[in-house]
Amino acid sequence: MENVYDLAIIGSGPAGLAAALYGARAKMKTIMIEGQKVGGQIVITHEVANYPGSVREATGPSLIERMEEQANEFGAEKVMDKIVDVDLDGKIKVIKGEKAEYKAKSVILATGAAPRLAGCPGEQELTGKGVSYCATCDADFFEDMEVFVVGGGDTAVEEAMYLAKFARKVTIVHRRDELRAAKSIQEKAFKNPKLDFMWNSAIEEIKGDGIVESAVFKNLVTGETTEYFANEEDGTFGIFVFIGYIPKSDVFKGKITLDDAGYIITDDNMKTNVEGVFAAGDIRVKSLRQVVTACADGAIAATQAEKYVEANFEE
């Protein structure tokens, strides 16, 4: 079938790249479609210490670069195009992008998840102007300044420690009276002299004229609010939000079975409720969202897609 791919992968994080590698190596005509940038959430990770075989100096971007090179080496195609609709019911699946339409015998959904917003006034208006969701991207903008980190899980605390390499002081703002991060991570954080903690608190509002100038915090126990102002010398300060992610599955609603949170439901073979459609990585319902599990998902999904195509399409 001319202009019909054996495998189309939507998304290019670790799951999508692993799927592209396995699909291309299996001699499937493979295309990977990405709407923003290759790499997914891992590109904002300054250190990848829990991926087997990664060296101490491994960063998210460097790992993604090697994965992409591998997929390209085996012939996987890549296009940058934002997907606006999908038709997954037919034997030939149709993926509609802003630039073009793509047809495939099988599809892997690997769109991942996006950072969850704090949801306070001023946050979106001042994103990129003091508000950030990426320590690796923006830490150096706050050299020797004060920074607030919203969140208390593994990512929040790890990124706070990274930010402490640049900032004069880092305050972790957490809704509870204890961190949710792993104990080993907590131990490191409590020993870091640059880290401070604002317990039982939430950020209520972010203010500024084109740049973050102040922020209002609320104690959730007492109800008391406190406004922090940038000092005159700095002129601003950083607010980094790390409170989890939201699945990027809006385009698949009504087309595929999702759970209440919007994650795609699959079986152990990454199969969705639609024949020939698989899901991999952070977009699907799973107990652990890490690079290593995303890669495993991608490999399984591509292998199952290969079997599906062989069983349902003639040469």
From Swiss-Prot:
It catalyses: [thioredoxin]-dithiol + NADP(+) = [thioredoxin]-disulfide + NADPH + H(+). GO terms for cellular component: cytoplasm. It holds the Pfam family Pyr_redox_2. The keyword Lipid biosynthesis does not apply. Transmembrane segments: none annotated. Keywords: Cytoplasm, Disulfide bond, FAD, Flavoprotein, NADP, Oxidoreductase, Redox-active center. GO terms for biological process: removal of superoxide radicals. GO terms for molecular function: thioredoxin-disulfide reductase (NADPH) activity. The keyword Magnesium does not apply. Disulfide bonds join C134-C137. FAD binds at residues 34-41, 282-291. PANTHER family: THIOREDOXIN REDUCTASE 1-RELATED-RELATED. Homodimer. The active site is a redox-active disulfide bond. This is Thioredoxin reductase. The gene is trxB.
